[in-house]
């Protein structure tokens, strides 16, 4: 079987992106962990980002947000 006739990955056949597939796999692994490793992994799951609004071509003060998958 050549590379051009190889089977499509099952995540692509299911209509998913690789990022979506890897996020689901990571969540399953985190749910299988025992304490204290489970709570450590949950603390690393949070996402920190900043949002800046622009008015009249000038950036206002950015606000920092923290989101989790809860």
Curated annotation (Swiss-Prot):
Family annotation (PANTHER family): ATP SYNTHASE EPSILON CHAIN, MITOCHONDRIAL, ATP SYNTHASE SUBUNIT EPSILON, MITOCHONDRIAL
Name this protein carries in UniProt: ATP synthase subunit epsilon, mitochondrial
Pfam families listed in its UniProt record: ATP-synt_Eps
Family: Belongs to the eukaryotic ATPase epsilon family.
Gene Ontology cellular-component annotations: mitochondrial inner membrane; proton-transporting ATP synthase complex
Main location: mitochondrion
GO MF annotation, one: proton-transporting ATP synthase activity, rotational mechanism
Subunit structure: F-type ATPases have 2 components, CF(1) - the catalytic core - and CF(0) - the membrane proton channel. CF(1) has five subunits: alpha(3), beta(3), gamma(1), delta(1), epsilon(1). CF(0) has three main subunits: a, b and c.
Gene3D superfamilies found in the cross-reference section: ATP synthase, F1 complex, epsilon subunit superfamily, mitochondrial
Record keywords, A-Z: ATP synthesis, CF(1), Hydrogen ion transport, Ion transport, Membrane, Mitochondrion, Mitochondrion inner membrane, Transport
GO biological process terms on file: proton motive force-driven mitochondrial ATP synthesis
Described purpose of this protein according to its UniProt entry: Mitochondrial membrane ATP synthase (F(1)F(0) ATP synthase or Complex V) produces ATP from ADP in the presence of a proton gradient across the membrane which is generated by electron transport complexes of the respiratory chain. F-type ATPases consist of two structural domains, F(1) - containing the extramembraneous catalytic core, and F(0) - containing the membrane proton channel, linked together by a central stalk and a peripheral stalk. During catalysis, ATP synthesis in the catalytic domain of F(1) is coupled via a rotary mechanism of the central stalk subunits to proton translocation.
Localization (cell): Mitochondrion; Mitochondrion inner membrane
Protein's organism: Zea mays
InterPro entries with a match to the protein in the record: ATP_synth_F1_esu_mt, ATP_synth_F1_esu_sf_mt
């Amino acid at each position: 079987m050549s590379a051009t006739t190889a089977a499509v990955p099952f995540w692509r056949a299911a209509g998913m992106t690789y990022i979506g597939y890897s996020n689901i796999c990571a969540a399953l692994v985190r749910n299988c962990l025992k304490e204290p490793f489970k709570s450590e992994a949950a603390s690393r799951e949070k996402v920190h980002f900043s949002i800046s609004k622009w008015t009249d071509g000038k950036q206002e003060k950015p606000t920092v947000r923290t989101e989790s998958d809860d």
